Amino acid sequence: MKKVLLFALIFAGICSFTIKIQQDKPPILVKENSISYLYGSKALKTEGSVSKQNGNFMRFSGPATMEWSIQVPAAGTYEVQLTHSVKTAADGNSVTIATGNSTVNYTLVPTQGVFGTGSYERILLKDKLELKAGTQQLTLTVPATAKGPVMDLRAVELVPVAGKAAIQADERQAIRSRASTEWLAKAGYGLMFHYTSQSVSRDGSKLPYETAIDQFDVNKYAEMVEQTGAKYVIFTIGHAQQYCPAPIASWEKAHPGMTTKRDLIAEIANALNKKGVKLILYMHSLGTGNFGKVDNPEFYKTFTDILKEFGDRYKDKVAGYWFDCWYQIFEGYPDIPIQDFFKVCKTGNKDRIICLNSWIYPAVSPWQEYWAGETTSPVALPKNGTIERGAGMGLRYQSLLIMEPYWVQDKAAMPPPRFTAEQLSKYIGECMQQGGAVTINMGIYQDGTVDEKALQVMKDVAAKIRK
């Protein structure tokens, strides 16, 4: 990537700004029947007090400009949505979005959602843009009068007025196609386990992955889960390294040498199901489909071949999927056939539910049933089972907490639980009253056991919630 960095001094060194030009960025094709997303990573130029942050968003701390090159097939009118976060808004802080002679202005106000003031929210702006046919530049400007911090920007979204009916019809179809999530709400709470190739034994040593899978005591594990009162488990398949604890041919094809002879997935599903506990599988979507290493069609085929085999093999033994990394996938492969993906996920079980993790951002698509809810700590409660604004809006509420200050137990020492039984019981109980569910990620050792202190917390939760 060729970058030109220019540094200039203004007013004798009182103020400075940086211009970043990325000359190899192709124009973004603006769609006529679906939403087009202009991410910071796709910008042709940035200038002023704006910088990219971890999580693929742009932080505006003062006056700044971003510019995208767009290719418009035919002239048309477009609504503008701003997916952004504003914690506090200084008087007069605003943004201007313009192309050619068409301009949209918006006065920034604090955004809201389950994370409180400053949550990411998708806001439809009042005015519309008139786009001419052909290649052109679209700019977003924060004026010189702005006082920081201004906002964090995820994307500018262009909604074709002529295609809005089709977009709304697709959303209605997605909602109609969803499987019931009532069982999740009735369950109230469950557990998640990041059992991965990075998990260690209690002494800090680590067995080869397949050896650890062969020695995993399924019955002891299921008995432990039963003691917690959890009614579902989210179990990790693949993570930082793409190991799968089952002999899945399509997985072996995509990730040679990273499957096992023992089908631990089936054994865990059977053991849990006998105890009235449902199994949801976590998949690291980037790694599962080799994101970034292959193009969109190959990524999609790899991923869906795996899902079809999983579906045919496990049928109703797998009640759901928790798909990670979908804001990255949707940014990298915006044309992924999401409706078809949704249908593939139902292979073998039409009632299977899925979520597409968008982290703290609004949902990437309505083609999912429940909110991934990667919150790590309690957040605002649902209303009637869902969320009214921001991340998770319109989806079944499921909040995912971490019992330890990390996801994977890759060290011998297990820190004290982050929550007491009283704290968890209060949050779970209040969520259940509003139709939501809470999942607690527990650190797990390579032998399938957990920390006794954390286990006691969950036993106490069970005594309070399941009484």
State the predicted function of each range.
Residues 21-74, 84-467:
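Mature catalytic domains of secreted/periplasmic carbohydrate-active enzymes
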Residues 1-23:
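Bacterial Sec-dependent N-terminal signal peptides
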Residues 80:
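P-loop NTPase switch module centered on the Walker A-proximal segment
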